Amino acid sequence: MGTKEILEFVKIEHTLFSLPFVLIGYILAYNQFFYESDSSNLEWIRMDLLWILVAAVGARGLAMALNRIIDRDIDAANPRTSGRHLVSGSMSMNTAWKLSAIFLGMLLIGAWQLNEVALMMAWLPVLAFIIYPYTKRYTWLCHLWLGLCLGLAPAGAWVAVAADVHGWAAITGLEGGDYLWFPTIFFISLGVALWITAFDINYARMDVESDRENGINSFPARFSDEITTRTSIQLTLLWFACFAISDPMSEIWFLGAAGLMSIANVGVILMRNRLNDFQSTLFRVSMLTGWVLLLAIILMDPSANVDTIIEG
């Protein structure tokens, strides 16, 4: 099996959703904890970015490989997905498991090179990825679970850097009798979760009939078309609110970018019946959302560090 087939198997283009938020998490943590560091710290801080990317690519590949393995029976029953690698036989289960092991290795090696906290918490995304394919068998909240999986992208990158300073307190919030609260990364991660949830609810419209026939609990299969549209718009407004509340570095760039992309996403959803290819348009606009927000973060003044709220 060649590189092209492997990239198709893991749908490499979907990495464009998570990658900008991985970078956003890294940039926020770097600006918060290391912007004023002396030059002796810069080399290993930049190496952190390399290992974060290795871990992120591994996590993304593992998530998709596990999804394909666990969902192969569902894929076989759906005309849209019946041509996928494991269903069609173009890839063996043995190869799929080997790829999963390689991606897991990338995740663990990247986390190991970062710090103890990153390595010890690597089980969390793995568990989330294993659970996700089963959620659609039992609840229409499966879309939210997928959103939470993607919400780990900025949170994981941020923790990987923050743990170099605060250790386990970057997660627990407890350090030396003080309670640490990091609102910016919390609301950005929550915003990502809601953004992906809104996208996935609309993405699932393609499989409504198949999902109903095969007992798959997607939101559009459970509820009406009108409710699906209304809910996805409400989720879009909620993710905009989360990004607005996060207010990284108190500048207008991020708020403006979030506002622009939320309007674009709502516009596409409302025009669904008038677009020649709603799914492709929604995919492009949703994918662009993360990159526009990343550009906004880059344009901000890095000296305006994100605040950490400390309570005794």
Where are these regions (language model features)?
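Multi-pass alpha-helical membrane architecture of UbiA-family
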Residues: 1-312
